[in-house]
Amino acid sequence: MAEAEEQETGSLEESTDESEEEESEEEPKLKYERLSNGVTEILQKDAASCMTVHDKFLALGTHYGKVYLLDVQGNITQKFDVSPVKINQISLDESGEHMGVCSEDGKVQVFGLYSGEEFHETFDCPIKIIAVHPHFVRSSCKQFVTGGKKLLLFERSWMNRWKSAVLHEGEGNIRSVKWRGHLIAWANNMGVKIFDIISKQRITNVPRDDISLRPDMYPCSLCWKDNVTLIIGWGTSVKVCSVKERHASEMRDLPSRYVEIVSQFETEFYISGLAPLCDQLVVLSYVKEISEKTEREYCARPRLDIIQPLSETCEEISSDALTVRGFQENECRDYHLEYSEGESLFYIVSPRDVVVAKERDQDDHIDWLLEKKKYEEALMAAEISQKNIKRHKILDIGLAYINHLVERGDYDIAARKCQKILGKNAALWEYEVYKFKEIGQLKAISPYLPRGDPVLKPLIYEMILHEFLESDYEGFATLIREWPGDLYNNSVIVQAVRDHLKKDSQNKTLLKTLAELYTYDKNYGNALEIYLTLRHKDVFQLIHKHNLFSSIKDKIVLLMDFDSEKAVDMLLDNEDKISIKKVVEELEDRPELQHVYLHKLFKRDHHKGQRYHEKQISLYAEYDRPNLLPFLRDSTHCPLEKALEICQQRNFVEETVYLLSRMGNSRSALKMIMEELHDVDKAIEFAKEQDDGELWEDLILYSIDKPPFITGLLNNIGTHVDPILLIHRIKEGMEIPNLRDSLVKILQDYNLQILLREGCKKILVADSLSLLKKMHRTQMKGVLVDEENICESCLSPILPSDAAKPFSVVVFHCRHMFHKECLPMPSMNSAAQFCNICSAKNRGPGSAILEMKK
């Protein structure tokens, strides 16, 4: 709502309107300010009657016949005494260099602001309107229209004389006119007409709707949205008219253009002025209301509405009631709405006031959001439009937002917003921390404090740590873990923790936190001691990370008690730092832990701990019998006699059997299996492993009077011992379980062996035949003999240099060649000849495959 001086009316109606506006949550679309400076001076002595607006200046007409040129701040730049009576209208061309003025006493002046007077005439009736050609500055466009009882078009001829033509008359006074391009629109008592100055034709007549209203009290408002769109406001009716070209086939005797009403609707109040705003309309309305107390009609504040025109109705976008000076005495005809197209400025003119309405910019939007305490939206709007805002700073809005959240008690949200708003400003961070301290909310801001860039004073971090230490051990521990140790004075915090431990020495949270502080302070010994006391999982990580092996040599038992697996792995991985001997010595009083260590050592390397293998026999026997036999099998350093003694003492049969067999006493081992274990399958398996005929004989002898053992032997020995030997020894009449099945199995095994042998024989014969054929094919191939070959005996060329001379050559399958005379004569026992070289090398004898003679 426009700023206004305080009114002394104190009317109920005005205060009601104000309260309604205050409660509205809808953001206004326009902002208002009173045009002051020179305008205030003028209106203190005179009253405004009309005004026109140019991009560069304003022209204001008064009831006392004065015309003032004003700058956009309202300062007077020029004054014209045109008439002693009311100025009815002022018109400017687009260049702003020429002005037309008409007054109630019939005077009309058209003159250049910088070039002097061009037209001056006094008519015999009041002239209500004047409009100069938009391009009046051009010599070809020296035209203007005036309106009183008739509409006259003045045009300067080629001899610099003005001639006039009547465009319209006979329908009452001309009360409004607007010139745009080649079209002139005017309103009289009957309606609105449009004239085309190019075709010299009147192209439309839009009749007025409500003829009951006096046209002098409720004048028509006209404005051109563009060169072809005229907006008409009269009474409570609004029409949007579009000027269109008529198709050539439709012209005949009709004008080349016609008007189509594209939108028509009624408003709630009487229209005093219209202006376009993009695709919307700005409407100045004269409002009359009825008092609830007196039931009399009174003049209320005028309204400035932004509406969206539709085809048959409209949508209200915003509506503002304007507190202009003297609105209680004004009539509908006293208000005017002028606008500047280039800057979207709207001037509400009344006799005692001129108010400027502007589209709200981003700064205004932020002002409204802050006023409504919508700080989050204001901050977002400022960030998005930070290049366009002039009056606001993002930081100031953010600080106001933080203060608002704190006042509302949303401490966590306020603290979280500090990260974004305060950024890297260390001074502001420290200021906000102290503010949170004053309200006892240091805990709220602690998670969001900067930890790197920027870094605050150590005192800030220490203050927060002390706050947590007094009331929240877990929170204190969390901060110590999360905050880098260089943010605060470590020794100060260590001392504070130790003071608290004096009151609660067994508090695990404080102990663990103290260990972490010691670690950061490189006091690893104290940290390790606490970790071991707490049996904390990070103890191994601490040892590895800081190479604390020298500190744990006397703490091996503690480590093993805490986590034997991790401890053993660590000790074995670092044998160079803690020797095997040292570990075994430390664990001497804890043989169960000693076994765990030595067992893992043996798994890694069978030879490293060989000196302890004898000890390990008793350790395995005591703590880990399942792994004793594998150990005995894999170890090459344990004393067998000692092992046998221990196993026999503990009656470990399987281990004793293994040791007896390993020491060569297989018969005793077999006997133990039979007598102690009574396991024929294991006995048979043992006999198979040893593959000793005497063992089989002992096994048969032991089993011959035990039917279950005989069954086991019959089922398993068929592939190692002739079953007949066992069957012949079975006593007559002895009942043997499953004998038939056992005999059938023996026969099946026997048949299977025969089939396997026959199959093998067939394969061997087939392979032999195949190889024989291959050898035959190879031996049947020819052998190349040429001059390069030599006799293997005399080493001379195998072929004579004289081809006519007779020769005899022998070539063996081994490819060695001899002169026949160089070979020894066959013996009496064998007529076959063999290669001397291959025979000398103990190779298989090769017989001659070719004998060449000539």
UniProtKB/Swiss-Prot annotation:
<dbReference type="GO" id="GO:0042802">
    <property type="term" value="F:identical protein binding"/>
</dbReference>
<keyword id="KW-0653">Protein transport</keyword>
<dbReference type="GO" id="GO:0005765">
    <property type="term" value="C:lysosomal membrane"/>
</dbReference>
<dbReference type="Pfam" id="PF23411">
    <property type="entry name" value="Beta-prop_Vps41"/>
</dbReference>
<dbReference type="GO" id="GO:0009267">
    <property type="term" value="P:cellular response to starvation"/>
</dbReference>
<dbReference type="GO" id="GO:0008270">
    <property type="term" value="F:zinc ion binding"/>
</dbReference>
<dbReference type="GO" id="GO:0005794">
    <property type="term" value="C:Golgi apparatus"/>
</dbReference>
<comment type="function">
    <text>Plays a role in vesicle-mediated protein trafficking to lysosomal compartments including the endocytic membrane transport and autophagic pathways. Acts as a component of the HOPS endosomal tethering complex. This complex is proposed to be involved in the Rab5-to-Rab7 endosome conversion probably implicating MON1A/B, and via binding SNAREs and SNARE complexes to mediate tethering and docking events during SNARE-mediated membrane fusion.</text>
</comment>
<comment type="similarity">
    <text>Belongs to the VPS41 family.</text>
</comment>
<keyword id="KW-0072">Autophagy</keyword>
<dbReference type="GO" id="GO:0035542">
    <property type="term" value="P:regulation of SNARE complex assembly"/>
</dbReference>
<dbReference type="GO" id="GO:0015630">
    <property type="term" value="C:microtubule cytoskeleton"/>
</dbReference>
<keyword id="KW-0813">Transport</keyword>
<dbReference type="GO" id="GO:0008017">
    <property type="term" value="F:microtubule binding"/>
</dbReference>
<dbReference type="InterPro" id="IPR000547">
    <property type="entry name" value="Clathrin_H-chain/VPS_repeat"/>
</dbReference>
<dbReference type="Pfam" id="PF23556">
    <property type="entry name" value="TPR_Vps41"/>
</dbReference>
<keyword id="KW-0472">Membrane</keyword>
<dbReference type="GO" id="GO:0005829">
    <property type="term" value="C:cytosol"/>
</dbReference>
<dbReference type="GO" id="GO:0030136">
    <property type="term" value="C:clathrin-coated vesicle"/>
</dbReference>
<dbReference type="GO" id="GO:0016020">
    <property type="term" value="C:membrane"/>
</dbReference>
<keyword id="KW-0968">Cytoplasmic vesicle</keyword>
<feature type="compositionally biased region" description="Acidic residues">
    <location>
        <begin position="14"/>
        <end position="26"/>
    </location>
</feature>
<dbReference type="InterPro" id="IPR016902">
    <property type="entry name" value="VPS41"/>
</dbReference>
<dbReference type="GO" id="GO:0005770">
    <property type="term" value="C:late endosome"/>
</dbReference>
<dbReference type="GO" id="GO:0010008">
    <property type="term" value="C:endosome membrane"/>
</dbReference>
<keyword id="KW-0950">Spinocerebellar ataxia</keyword>
<comment type="subunit">
    <text>(Microbial infection) The interaction with STX17 is decreased in presence of SARS coronavirus-2/SARS-CoV-2 ORF3A protein.</text>
</comment>
<feature type="repeat" description="CHCR">
    <location>
        <begin position="568"/>
        <end position="712"/>
    </location>
</feature>
<keyword id="KW-0963">Cytoplasm</keyword>
<dbReference type="GO" id="GO:0005764">
    <property type="term" value="C:lysosome"/>
</dbReference>
<keyword id="KW-0967">Endosome</keyword>
<comment type="subunit">
    <text>Component of the homotypic fusion and vacuole protein sorting (HOPS) complex; the core of which composed of the class C Vps proteins VPS11, VPS16, VPS18 and VPS33A, is associated with VPS39 and VPS41. Interacts with RILP, MON1B. Interacts with ARL8B (GTP-bound form); involved in recruitment to lysosomes and probably hierarchial assembly of the HOPS complex at lysosomal membranes. In vitro can self-assemble into a lattice. Associates with adapter protein complex 3 (AP-3) and clathrin:AP-3 complexes. Interacts with STX17; this interaction is increased in the absence of TMEM39A.</text>
</comment>
<feature type="region of interest" description="Disordered">
    <location>
        <begin position="1"/>
        <end position="33"/>
    </location>
</feature>
<keyword id="KW-0862">Zinc</keyword>
<keyword id="KW-0479">Metal-binding</keyword>
<keyword id="KW-0458">Lysosome</keyword>
<dbReference type="GO" id="GO:0006623">
    <property type="term" value="P:protein targeting to vacuole"/>
</dbReference>
<dbReference type="GO" id="GO:0031902">
    <property type="term" value="C:late endosome membrane"/>
</dbReference>
<dbReference type="InterPro" id="IPR011990">
    <property type="entry name" value="TPR-like_helical_dom_sf"/>
</dbReference>
<dbReference type="Pfam" id="PF23555">
    <property type="entry name" value="zf-RING_Vps41"/>
</dbReference>
<dbReference type="GO" id="GO:0008333">
    <property type="term" value="P:endosome to lysosome transport"/>
</dbReference>
<keyword id="KW-0225">Disease variant</keyword>
